Amino acid sequence: QVTPQMVQKQLKQTPDIRTVVITSPTYDGVVSDIQSIADTVHAYGIPLIVDEAHGAHFGFSPEFPENATRLGADAVIMSVHKTLPAFTQTALLHLCSDRIAEKKVAQFLGIYETSSPSYLLMAGIEKSLQIIEKDREMLFAAYSRRLAEFRDKTKNLKTLQVLQPSDFSKQEAFSFDPGKLLILTGNSMSGQALQEILLQEYGLQMEMASGNYVVAMTSIMDTDEGFARLSDALECIDGTVHKKEEISEISPREIYREQKTVMTIDQALDAEQKTVRLEEAAGAVSGDYVYLYPPGIPILVPGEAIDVQTAETIRHCIRLGLEVEGLP
């Protein structure tokens, strides 16, 4: 999570910061203390923008965290297609205060957005919001029940483990999205291996696989049958696997380190390039983006120096079976 103390430290160290942008919830469902962060940011007279792409369903039920539009954020971006019944590509930008000029936002939307928007997609957003407005209580009550029943049914797994929101300390997460199912492999296999078994043998597609866990996305549109299929599959897999030697996991902090910028992105892309082996890359400058997908956050950006630790981190991700994009 991002804490108010982290934000305060950065604002003190870099007084020319004009805007603070944070992601909450994260891809894994970790939620930061938006209200306290907003208070910290506003004390410096600047706005807070929250990337709440995975939190479009927040604020509709007491079983879920509040959404950032009600917690002091000045602008909030929600991908309604991720967790609400809307078409892929659809999202909402909320302007919540006058710290961000609406006229300026409209001006840049006119520059960056298409001049031929899809009315099908826009109508899909409206329909999604109508569904929420009409049946919110029923949908979220059923959703919360399904999640609770799933976690209760899978709590006695011997090797695999479905994380409970209570498993996170306040240092790790201010809050947690119960709709994200984090399934740990218990060092019985890699997350990638578990994802493959669930897909190939049970027809269940996970959202993401990491070193020793997978993430399952759920929503108000999931059914009792869908949750039962996943819990039954996990019980079957759990009965056939056992803990092995420790799998060397790698944390997001190790993967997404701050890198030294040697030249701008356009300079790096236009420069003469050559391909080298990863173990020989330390000391070179990246000529392309290197990232794990999902979620697509860059490990390296063109123009950044490649040090020994970063090269080894990329090699370790490959050994774990993670999807590393951007390598030749």
Question: At which residue positions do the language-model features occur?
Answer:
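Conserved C-terminal alpha-helix-loop-beta "cap" of PLP-dependent enzymes
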Residues: 152-326
